[in-house]
């Protein structure tokens, strides 16, 4: 059983405060307040049952990019607090040379007002075979990895800024992603 408290205050990164470009819409100089984070987490680890992690995050003065009224991506700062709660359960076990690695996470951001969008449900699952080969000169892992996240407004990317920005027009997710892998 373990607990942790983390408190920080830091300036938004440089792209939020100063950006100069030959594009008229991409020039700004801002005097944003420090972003203040308070994070509390509890973690329970058990080889017999499962691992459990609880996180509570409180963010004040979050800096973010989004499109303005003229559809240009600009920096903004949200002066209220945003609260994020995460609950993660994970379990890894094996049967002979077959391995199962499973994780599920529920998360919710409150008072985010469309500024911090997160999927409510995330799962990551791997099923694979692992064994030594060639007189233990090689360890082989091969199997499938399946990931899923619930539909949400995923951030878009602005290549001029090299930054992600908030968008609230198209939801993404709600379907599984499967990969086959071989590690040697």
Which stretches of residues belong to each language-model region?
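Exposed, low-structure sequence patches enriched in small/polar residues
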Residues: 1-184
């Amino acid at each position: 059983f373990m607990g942790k408290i983390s408190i920080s205050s830091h300036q938004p990164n440089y792209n939020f405060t100063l950006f100069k470009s030959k594009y008229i819409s991409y020039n700004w100089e801002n005097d944003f307040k420090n972003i203040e984070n308070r994070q509390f987490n509890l973690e329970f680890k058990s080889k017999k049952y499962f691992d459990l992690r609880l996180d509570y995050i409180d963010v004040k003065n979050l800096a973010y990019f989004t499109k303005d009224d003229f559809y240009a991506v600009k920096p903004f700062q949200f002066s209220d607090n945003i609260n994020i709660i995460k609950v993660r359960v994970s379990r890894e076990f094996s049967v002979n040379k077959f391995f199962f690695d499973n994780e599920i996470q529920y998360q919710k951001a409150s008072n985010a007002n469309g500024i911090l969008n997160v999927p409510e449900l995330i799962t990551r699952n791997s099923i694979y075979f692992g064994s030594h080969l060639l007189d233990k000169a090689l360890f082989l892992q091969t199997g499938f990895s399946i990931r899923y996240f619930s539909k949400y407004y995923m951030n878009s990317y602005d290549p001029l800024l090299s930054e992600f920005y908030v968008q609230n027009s198209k939801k993404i997710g709600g379907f599984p992603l499967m990969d086959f892998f071989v590690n040697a």
